[in-house]
Structures are given as structure tokens and as C-alpha cells.
């Protein structure tokens, strides 16, 4: 088999290159339909794509022509891609083999014949498997969304064609005979005392009894379970040819999965499916993301005879989220891809749109990934157990990449289980990048932008967090923002919170965050979008134009600034053997410091500023309200505090960064008017920064003024004075407690204290609202009693009433008005009260904890060295690899069923075991000691100097005498106490002197005797 690289003369066979000029994606363009039909009917056999040569039986892994070379340019930034995708001087063509493994990772094994029948029922084997039946169900439409049915009517599901490119990854050893293979297939162990049966006989007897299971569509089937079969897996090394000197394997997908596809034909090879659907590729990456492109790693979309142009790369970052959160995100993404496939009148989308989209899932750490989430990916076909290796030729593997074009969709996601389907599914090109170690989310983005993105060269990159579910048309709406205006470098949509009705009362924290998100999407984001600069595009749901992110020829630019945060927050010392050692060392040497490190906790804010202020460019940022995504928010207070610590510190220092470097805007290509508007926005951000800085002091003053005013005798509220003193002491106690807990204590270890403080501030806020209303009503009553003519101006002559009305209307009234103008008022009725009661905690608790932990520049995760070894692939002298992988159909099918078993049933409830960490316990004792010490001293001071509000109970004429008398008493007590202690010590020393003198006299008398 050989693969001949197309030369430049065949460039007309490639998909048309990206063009940054505006394209009208309007419906009704018949010429665009004709264009799509012509392009989709282009035969794949044109040109010189002779990738199968039976005469030579050789492997030729020359690289396909990079798409970047013939890319249409419309800006100077495109020169970034002038260099070829691969350096051919470093690429070595693999030597030919005498006996190539022509079936590409398939052995001629008669032990399993794919879609065979069950030994009793005569049914296909996969239909009789209970695990398989419970994992797959028919396609189910969402009750709240009927658009998907309309999409299905415009899609021809029986006409999907994948690519047939063949990468021969496994071969027999050329120095051994057919009977001495490098790999021995799985064999069944015959128990001692039994004879081996002849071929064709069954190795077990029928047993009475049967088990009833549900079929794939809900029907009941009865079959008898065979006894367990003992297997021994005597795997030896198998020869792998690799690609460009890297371990790359094309692995067959389990027949248990392929047999579910509507066009599967068991009589044909690979079920009659194209290799793109029948094989999954694994690549062991032994370099860092910055060297992925340089080291000539290649991905499937650009490795086909006609390389595919990626219009949209969807990046999903994952840490330890379970299968439910991952399933929600993938369900939303798959639905969006189906919508793009259904757009028959679009010049860009429509038939075969799935070939322009790559879904990239990056998991942060092999030992951190959730087992059920990994099993879900295996159910989709994009992951197989047993392929990954920890080392390749003594080099550590830094990432495991699995590529597959899946035709498995997600039918339904409940609160506890994910159901798969193969009905009405549009193919999806998926890439699963499993990082070997946990290196934080920003490192995951670096793998996408610096490694995967450099090879695929997508036009638009969409960032999603695992658990964020985009609505049915959100990705198209985001893409349209870039297509309409070539100046748009980044865009974000509206993020909504996942709400449960019962949490409205049981967990007001969730609904309070919902109100915060809604107001931000109604007031903040649209305002910033009007200026062309959004201070932060949330990493949970945003999109960027890939070419706008690129650095200049000197390596300076948005991505360079964006990725500095990874090196500043890295834990531990740098590894000298790391291929990125010099780059990381240089970053740390130039940028280390608390200010810079905290600034890069909000690296997405730095990226936004660098895009708008990019030298010689006029990029803009937009907010797309029609694009929506739902996400989960922290439900626990400890998790919420930790999240906001990073947000507040990062946004505070990032705001300072943008204000200090505002002059960079003048080096951009923005018009003079745009630069003036940007400066107006910067001035607004400066005011907002000042208000945030003094927010805790301002809130205390408002509290003190309202409570003391309510205690005035003229208002006639008798408990006012007493309550003002009680709330003052509790307020100060809460503030001091928060300060003490914030220094060195983890919120999870002292969560009960934080809950108590938040509840107190909620009660305090309710009292302050009552005080404001009571005083306003009293002012109106005074006006009526005075008999003065009622006018509008009269209400504003009363200073207290005027200030209250202005402050209230400028916030809460505007919230109502803006919400109704956007036709989204419901959060004002369901979440407004919760947010108001939580607002004091936002000001006091969150700000105090954030500023007390400025020195904590971590993301809440620590680097680790990885889990147990997965084995090693050895490089031979001829450039091939010796590797041990499962290759028999029995193993592959059993592995697939084992993965489905993990997600078949809901996950068992987690047992909440209260384990007190020793460090948390000692920190708790320390904090309590400090608090008792501080409060007892404060009580003495307050009683003596009348500073704790006690002066409110004393008449002004007697206040001076009372203070003087208490001070005199205090001094008298202190002086006499000091005198007594001195006298006591004097008596003690005299007694010691007398007794010592007595002992010496006795000793001398005894000596004379």
C-alpha cells in the first residue's frame, strides 16, 4: 500500500480555502445550492491518489500538501502560515515490509465472525446483550424543542459517505513465520480433567432457567445465559509502522457498535462502512503542545487524500466531570451540528457540513478523568481501552489523542443516566485528547490552540466547558457574528443557569447566581458590545477567530499573553528534560510576581484586551444574545467562595492591567472615533474599579446610617436603638471572623461558619430594607401632617427621602425596566429576592476572602506525575514499533461492552463520609483561639470607651461624666492590679530569699557538727 502526496497541480481538488471577506449566508440563494451539489459530487479518484499499490506491498507515509500553502489571503496576518505544515527534512519514510498487515489492525481470526448469531435464540449477538440494550435506545425528541424534527426532514441520513484512506498500522513480524506471530490471539483455557472438543462443538451444556431482558427498542427477550468463559490473554509484541516516527495506530471499531448503524452489512468487510466510520486512530504524543506542529504530528481531517478544511473547531475542556455533564454538552453540540447539516440554502453549511466541524474534547489528567465520562466516550467509539502507552522509545507520552468520526448520538440525558442512539444521527468528527498529567484548564486550551489548531487551521474556535449545553442554534448564531463582520475577533453568547424549582427555597445561592447572570446579560454585556470591547469572554461559552489570535513574527501577540498564566501558576520545579523547558523558564524569569500572577488568574480578560489593542489591527468583540448555553453553577458555599476568589482577584488585577496599558489602543488600526469610544469605556471601568475598592467601607456606612437613623426617637420605632447596637456587634463580629477564617483556612473546612455569616448578612439586609421603607413612609407622613401642598419637587426637598429614591430607582427599578424591555422579566420574580439577600455577602465575605488570599495564585488544582504505567512502545532500527495492543475482534468487542456496562445504570449515590483533615482541624483551633482573644479584648475596650454603641442609651449631658467615671474606675482597677501583682512577686522573692538563707544556715551548722 502506498500513499502518493498530491502536488500543487492538484490543488483544485481541495475544498475551497478560507476567505476572511464577508460572505452572505442568507437563505434562498439557488446558486449556492448548485455550488454545494457540484462540490459534493467531486470524485475522490481524480488526480494521483493511488493510495493502494498491490505490486509493492510498501508503506509510504509522505505528507499531504498543507492547506495553508494555497490559502487565499486577505490580510497580512495570513503570512503566519507561510511555512509548511511539516518539515520534510525531519520526516523519514517508513521502510517497506515483506509481509504487511493488509487488513490494518485486523487479524484473520475465525474465533469471532462479527455479527454472528446467539447460540440458542438465533438472534444477532449484540441484540441479546443486556448492557448493549440498556445503553442504546431509539431517538427521542426534546419536549421543549420541536425544531429538531424539522431538521430531520431536510437531512438524508442514508447518504453519509466517509473517507476510505488506509493507514496500515499493524503488520506481522518480517523475521518470523506465520505460525510465530508477534501477537498470540486470545485463547480459552480448558479446565483440567476435560477434553478439548472438536471444532464446531459447544464447550458448555444447556442450563435450565432463563433471564428476561429488554431489547434495544423496549421489547422483552428471553435467553439462557452461558457459563462464564475463562480467557487468557497471552499478548506479545505486535509490529506497528507508525507515522513520521510517531506511534500512530488505526484501530478497528467494535462490531458491537458498527452493527447498530443502519447501513451496516455483515457480509461485507467492515460492515460495508467506510474506513472513517469503521476505524479509530490513536496517536501517542511525546512533545508539548508548542512543538506538536514542528514535530510533524498529523490529524485525520488533513490526512485524507483530499484534506478537509475546518470551518468550526469546538473545544470542550474537561477535568473530572461525570458522564451526565459531558452528555449534556455533547447532546447540545450534536444538535447544533444537525442544524448546520440541515441548512440547505446556506453558502457555507448544508450537505456534508459535518466534514467542516471538529469536536475536540481535552481531558485534564489521565488519573483525574471520571470513569463514567471515559466510558461514555468509549460508547461513542472515540476511545478504546488498552491502546494508550506511557512511553514511546523512552520518551514520556504527554497526551493521548483518539480520533474517530462517530455516528452515535445522545438520545436522552436524565439526572442519572445517558442514553445513546444511532437513529437520525449526523456524523461528527471527534478528537479526544487525554493529557497524561493534570496541568490546569489553560494548558488544555494551549493543546487546542498551539497543537491541534495549528494543524487543522480552523476558521472559528468555540470554547465550551464540560457541563455547558448550547441550545440548538447557538453555534450557528455565534459563527454568523464572524461571517457578518470580518472585524469580529471574538464573540460570546448568553450563559444561563441550570435551575431546579425546588432550589428556589432550598438553595437560594443558585437562584441568586441566576439573577446575577441575567442582569449581566441584559445590562453589562450589551453595553460593552456597543463599544466593541467586552471585558471578558467567558471560557465556558465563547468563540474566537483563529487567525486573530495568532502572534506576530516575533512571537508577541494575544496567545503569547494568554498562555503566560500557565507557566506563572505551574506547581513544582521545571523538568530539565521537558521539550518546552527553555520557553517555560524564560516566561517564569520575566513575569514572576504576585501582581502578574493574580492578573493571569483571569487570563481570558487579558486575551480580550490584547485582541482589541493588537498592533496594526482593528479587531472587535461582540455579544450575541441569540446564542444561549446552559451551565451548572456552584451549589455549595465553599465551592462558590473558591470560584469567586479567582474571579475577583483575576478581574481586579486584569482591570488594572487594561487601564495601565490603555495607550496600546493607539497602536491599533481602529478609527479615531472608535479609539475615543474605547477610552470612554476605560473611564467607566476606572469608576467601577474605584467603587469596588471602597465597596466594603461604603456598605458599612450605609448600614450604620440607616440603623442609627431608625433608632431616632422622632421616628417612633422603639426597638431601633437596641437593634442598632446588636446588629453593630454582630456585623463587626462577622467581619472579624471572616478576616480570621480567610487567612489560612480552607472554605471547605469552615463552611458552617461561612453559612452562619451569610445567613446573618441576609437578615441584616432585610432589616436595612425595612429601615429604608420605614423612613420613607415616615417622611411622606410628615409632609401630609404639615398640610403643605403636595408636589413632586417637595418629595425631593427631604434629603433622606431623596437619596433613598434615587439610589433605589437607579438600581432595582432599572433592573425591572431593562428586563421587561428584553422580554425576560421572570428572573425578577423568581431570583430577585434571593440576590438582594445575598448581596451583602458578595460585598463582605467574597471580597474579604479574595483579598486575604492574593498570595494564593493557584487554580485549586495541583500538578501530579500521572497514574500507573500503561506500558511502552519500543522503536526498532527499521523505524517501526514493538507494541502490545488488543487486536482480536473478541477483545475489542468485549472491551466495548465493558465500557457500556459502566454507564448502563445510574451511578450509585456517593456516601458522604465526614473526614476531618488534620490541617483543617489545626487551622480551625488556631482561628477560634484568635477570635476569642480578639473579641474579649474588644469587649473591654467597648465598655470602657463607649465605642460599641452603648453611648446611644445615655443622654448627651451625662455622656462626658460617664466616660470620665468609667475611665477612672478602669485605671484604678488596672493600677491596683499591677500593684498587687508586683507586691505578690515581691513577697514571693522575699520568701525564697528567707528559705534559701535558712537552708544555708542549716547546712553550715550540719557541717560544723
UniProtKB/Swiss-Prot annotation:
E.C. number? 2.4.1.16
- Quote a single Gene Ontology cellular component term: cell septum
CDD domains in alphabetical order: Chitin_synth_C
Q: What does this protein do?
A: Polymerizes chitin, a structural polymer of the cell wall and septum, by transferring the sugar moiety of UDP-GlcNAc to the non-reducing end of the growing chitin polymer.
Instruction: Cite a single GO MF annotation.
Output: chitin synthase activity
The reply on keyword Cell membrane is yes
Residue stretches of biased makeup (Acidic residues): 192-202
Question: Which family is this protein grouped under?
Answer: Belongs to the chitin synthase family.
Q: Where is this region: Disordered?
A: 1-62, 175-234
Transmembrane residue ranges: 647-667, 682-702, 722-742, 757-777, 804-823, 930-950, 967-987
Membrane topology, from the record: Multi-pass membrane protein
Organism's domain of life? Eukaryota
Q: What is this protein called?
A: Chitin synthase 2
Q: Which UniProt keywords apply?
A: Cell membrane, Cell wall biogenesis/degradation, Glycosyltransferase, Membrane, Transferase, Transmembrane, Transmembrane helix
Which GO BP annotation is one of this protein's? Answer: cell wall organization
Amino acid at each position: 500500500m502506498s500513499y502518493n502526496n498530491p502536488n500543487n497541480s492538484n490543488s483544485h481538488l481541495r475544498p475551497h480555502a478560507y476567505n476572511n471577506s464577508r460572505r452572505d449566508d442568507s437563505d434562498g440563494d439557488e446558486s449556492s445550492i448548485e455550488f454545494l451539489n457540484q462540490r459534493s459530487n467531486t470524485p475522490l479518484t481524480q488526480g494521483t491518489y493511488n493510495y493502494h499499490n498491490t505490486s509493492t506491498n510498501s508503506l509510504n507515509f509522505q505528507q499531504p500538501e498543507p492547506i495553508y500553502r494555497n490559502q487565499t489571503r486577505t490580510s497580512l496576518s495570513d503570512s503566519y502560515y507561510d511555512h509548511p505544515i511539516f518539515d520534510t527534512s525531519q520526516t523519514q519514510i517508513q521502510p517497506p515490509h515483506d509481509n504487511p498487515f493488509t487488513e490494518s489492525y485486523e487479524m484473520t481470526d475465525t474465533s469471532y465472525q462479527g455479527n454472528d448469531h446467539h447460540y440458542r435464540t438465533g438472534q444477532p449477538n449484540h441484540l441479546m446483550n443486556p448492557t448493549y440494550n440498556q445503553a442504546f435506545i431509539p431517538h427521542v425528541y426534546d419536549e421543549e424543542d420541536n425544531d429538531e424534527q424539522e431538521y430531520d426532514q431536510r437531512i438524508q441520513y442514508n447518504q453519509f459517505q466517509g473517507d476510505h484512506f488506509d493507514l496500515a498500522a499493524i503488520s506481522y513480524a518480517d523475521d518470523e513465520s506465520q505460525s510465530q506471530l508477534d501477537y498470540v490471539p486470545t485463547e480459552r483455557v480448558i479446565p483440567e480433567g476435560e477434553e478439548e472438543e472438536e471444532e464446531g462443538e459447544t464447550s458448555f451444556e444447556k442450563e435450565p432457567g432463563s433471564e428476561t431482558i429488554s431489547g434495544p427498542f423496549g421489547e422483552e427477550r428471553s435467553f439462557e445465559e452461558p457459563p462464564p468463559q475463562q480467557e487468557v490473554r497471552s499478548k506479545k509484541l505486535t509490529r506497528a509502522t507508525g507515522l513520521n516516527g510517531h506511534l500512530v495506530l488505526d484501530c478497528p471499531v467494535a462490531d458491537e457498535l458498527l452493527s447498530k448503524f443502519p447501513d451496516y452489512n455483515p457480509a461485507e468487510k467492515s460492515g460495508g462502512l467506510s474506513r472513517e466510520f469503521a476505524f479509530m486512530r490513536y496517536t501517542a504524543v511525546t512533545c508539548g503542545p508548542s512543538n506538536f506542529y514542528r514535530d510533524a504530528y498529523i490529524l485525520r481531517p488533513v490526512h485524507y487524500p483530499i484534506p478537509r478544511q475546518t470551518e468550526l473547531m469546538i473545544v470542550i475542556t474537561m477535568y473530572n466531570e461525570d458522564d451526565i455533564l459531558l452528555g449534556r454538552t455533547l447532546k447540545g453540540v450534536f444538535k447544533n451540528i444537525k442544524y448546520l447539516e440541515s441548512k440547505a440554502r446556506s453558502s457555507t453549511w448544508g450537505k456534508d457540513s459535518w466534514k467542516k466541524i471538529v469536536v475536540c474534547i481535552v481531558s485534564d489528567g489521565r488519573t483525574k478523568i471520571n470513569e463514567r465520562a471515559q466510558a461514555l466516550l468509549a460508547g461513542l467509539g472515540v476511545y478504546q481501552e488498552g491502546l494508550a502507552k506511557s512511553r514511546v522509545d523512552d520518551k514520556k507520552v504527554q497526551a493521548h489523542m483518539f480520533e474517530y468520526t462517530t455516528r452515535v448520538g445522545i438520545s436522552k440525558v436524565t439526572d442519572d443516566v445517558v442514553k445513546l442512539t444511532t437513529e437520525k444521527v449526523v456524523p461528527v468528527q471527534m478528537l479526544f485528547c487525554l493529557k497524561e498529567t493534570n496541568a490546569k484548564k489553560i494548558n488544555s486550551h494551549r493543546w487546542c490552540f498551539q497543537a491541534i489548531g495549528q494543524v487543522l487551521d480552523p476558521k472559528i474556535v468555540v470554547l465550551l466547558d464540560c457541563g455547558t449545553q448550547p441550545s440548538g442554534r447557538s453555534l450557528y448564531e455565534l459563527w454568523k457574528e464572524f461571517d457578518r463582520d470580518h472585524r469580529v475577533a471574538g464573540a460570546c453568547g448568553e450563559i444561563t443557569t441550570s435551575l431546579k424549582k425546588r432550589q428556589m427555597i432550598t438553595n437560594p445561592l443558585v437562584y441568586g447566581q441566576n439573577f446575577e447572570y441575567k442582569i449581566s446579560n441584559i445590562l453589562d454585556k450589551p453595553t460593552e458590545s456597543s463599544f466593541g470591547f467586552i471585558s471578558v469572554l467567558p471560557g465556558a461559552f465563547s468563540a474566537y477567530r483563529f487567525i486573530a489570535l495568532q502572534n506576530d513574527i516575533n512571537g508577541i501577540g494575544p496567545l503569547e499573553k494568554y498562555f503566560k498564566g500557565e507557566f506563572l501558576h505551574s506547581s513544582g520545579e521545571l523538568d530539565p528534560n521537558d521539550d518546552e523547558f527553555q520557553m517555560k523558564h524564560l516566561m517564569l524569569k520575566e513575569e514572576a510576581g504576585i501582581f502578574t500572577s493574580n492578573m493571569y488568574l483571569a487570563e481570558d480578560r487579558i486575551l480580550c484586551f490584547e485582541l482589541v489593542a493588537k498592533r496594526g489591527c482593528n479587531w472587535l468583540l461582540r455579544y450575541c444574545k441569540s446564542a444561549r448555553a446552559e451551565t451548572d453553577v456552584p451549589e455549595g458555599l465553599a465551592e462558590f467562595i473558591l470560584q469567586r476568589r479567582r474571579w475577583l482577584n483575576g478581574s481586579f488585577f486584569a482591570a488594572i492591567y487594561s487601564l495601565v496599558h490603555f495607550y496600546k489602543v493607539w497602536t491599533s488600526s481602529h478609527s479615531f472615533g472608535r479609539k475615543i469610544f474605547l477610552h470612554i469605556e476605560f473611564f467607566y471601568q476606572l469608576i467601577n474599579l474605584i467603587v469596588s475598592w471602597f465597596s466594603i467601607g461604603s456598605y458599612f456606612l450605609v448600614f450604620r446610617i440607616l440603623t442609627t437613623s431608625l433608632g431616632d426617637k422622632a421616628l417612633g420605632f422603639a426597638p431601633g436603638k437596641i437593634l442598632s447596637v446588636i446588629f453593630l456587634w454582630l456585623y463587626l463580629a462577622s467581619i472579624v471572623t471572616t478576616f480570621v477564617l480567610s487567612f489560612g483556612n480552607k472554605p471547605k473546612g469552615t463552611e458552617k461558619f461561612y453559612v452562619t455569616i451569610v445567613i446573618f448578612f441576609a437578615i441584616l439586609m432585610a432589616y436595612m430594607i425595612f429601615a429604608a421603607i420605614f423612613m420613607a413612609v415616615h417622611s411622606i407622613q410628615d409632609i401630609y401632617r404639615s398640610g403643605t401642598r403636595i408636589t413632586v419637587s417637595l418629595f425631593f426637598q427631604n434629603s433622606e427621602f431623596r437619596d433613598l429614591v434615587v439610589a433605589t430607582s437607579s438600581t432595582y427599578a432599572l433592573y425591572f425596566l431593562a428586563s421587561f424591555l428584553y422580554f425576560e422579566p421572570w428572573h425578577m420574580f423568581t431570583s430577585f429576592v434571593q440576590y438582594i439577600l445575598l448581596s451583602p455577602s458578595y460585598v463582605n465575605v467574597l471580597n474579604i476572602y479574595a483579598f486575604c488570599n492574593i498570595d494564593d495564585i493557584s487554580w485549586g488544582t495541583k500538578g501530579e506525575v500521572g497514574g500507573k504505567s500503561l506500558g511502552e512502545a519500543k522503536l526498532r532500527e527499521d523505524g517501526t514499533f514493538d507494541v502490545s495492543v488488543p487486536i482480536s475482534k473478541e477483545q475489542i468487542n468485549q472491551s466495548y461492552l465493558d465500557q457500556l456496562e459502566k454507564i448502563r445504570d445510574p451511578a450509585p449515590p456517593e456516601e458522604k463520609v465526614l473526614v476531618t483533615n488534620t490541617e483543617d482541624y489545626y487551622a480551625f483551633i488556631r482561628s477560634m483561639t484568635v477570635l476569642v482573644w480578639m473579641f474579649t479584648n474588644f469587649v473591654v475596650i467597648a465598655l470602657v470607651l463607649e465605642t460599641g454603641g452603648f453611648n446611644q442609651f445615655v443622654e448627651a449631658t451625662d455622656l462626658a461624666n460617664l466616660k470620665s467615671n468609667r475611665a477612672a474606675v478602669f485605671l484604678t482597677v488596672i493600677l491596683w492590679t499591677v500593684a498587687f501583682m508586683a507586691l505578690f512577686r515581691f513577697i514571693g522573692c522575699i520568701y525564697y530569699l528567707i528559705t534559701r538563707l535558712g537552708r544555708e544556715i542549716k547546712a553550715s551548722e550540719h557541717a560544723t557538727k
